[in-house]
A protein has these predicted regions:
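C-terminal auxiliary extensions adjacent to catalytic cores
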Residues: 1-231
Length: 231
């Protein structure tokens, strides 16, 4: 899946490079005896060509392509969060990664809720804008790409994708802390040879300290900034 998305991203970059280096005027005016390289060429005749090079559909289509990739990446990240917080699939880690079985703390359950909500919102916004052309300029521009809307959607959606990935990193860090503590406890208890005690200790890890909302939001924001600063 990630490979397919990398290919889609590469295609978008290729089209963007072409458009950045393309002539978008209309009409295109070619002076006599001047080649595209601004060198004298006696075979070139002066001419004016009316063309649709101004149209933004090449960019609009690849932006729509990228929009479809974003919720796919986010969905995969959310599924990993769900697997880590579900005791049926997290390979012995405590439910919702909190180690509290008395029901007084929901742990990282709401983290998965947040990721699920973001994935749903991203999937909703992935619908292409370029298929809804609305004529402008007294119908002189009777087919409009809406490429600017597509690009704006991509920018906004990338921020939400980073949010989902930050939530996954936060969850993974909590899971790793538990796994490390459980392994350390197992190693320490193994020296005593009390296997019943070892089994009980591993299956009932101590409750983790639940961060305050402000602390949680600060840490997730720091993860998002780190993602934005990375290559």
């Amino acid at each position: 899946v990630h490979g397919a998305i990398k290919d889609a991203y590469a295609q978008a970059c290729r089209v963007i490079d072409i458009e950045l280096n393309a002539v978008t005027d209309n009409p295109l005016v070619f002076p006599r005896n001047v080649s595209p390289d601004d060198e004298f060429d006696p075979t070139v005749e002066e001419t004016v060509i009316s063309a649709g090079n101004f149209h933004g559909m090449p960019l609009a289509l690849v932006m729509s392509y990228v929009k479809n990739c974003i919720p796919v990446l986010a969905s995969i990240a959310e599924r990993r969060i769900a697997k880590l917080t579900d005791p049926a699939t997290n390979d012995g880690l405590p439910p919702f990664l909190i180690g509290n079985e008395d029901g007084t703390d929901s742990g990282l359950m709401i983290v998965q809720y947040s990721a699920a909500a973001l994935v749903n919102d991203l999937a909703t916004r992935a619908h292409p804008a370029c298929v809804y052309s609305v004529p402008t300029s007294a119908n002189a521009e009777d087919h409009v790409s809406m490429g600017a809307n597509e690009a704006r959607h991509v920018l906004d959606m990338c921020g939400d994708l980073a949010h989902v990935i930050a939530l996954e990193l936060y969850t993974a860090a909590q899971a790793l802390d538990y796994r490390r503590d459980m392994l350390n406890a197992a190693r320490a208890l193994a020296k005593q040879g009390d296997w019943a005690l070892i089994a009980a200790r591993i299956s009932n890890p101590p409750a983790a300290e639940h961060p305050s909302r402000a602390q949680f939001e600060r840490e997730v924001s720091e993860l998002m900034r780190a993602l934005a600063d990375s290559d």
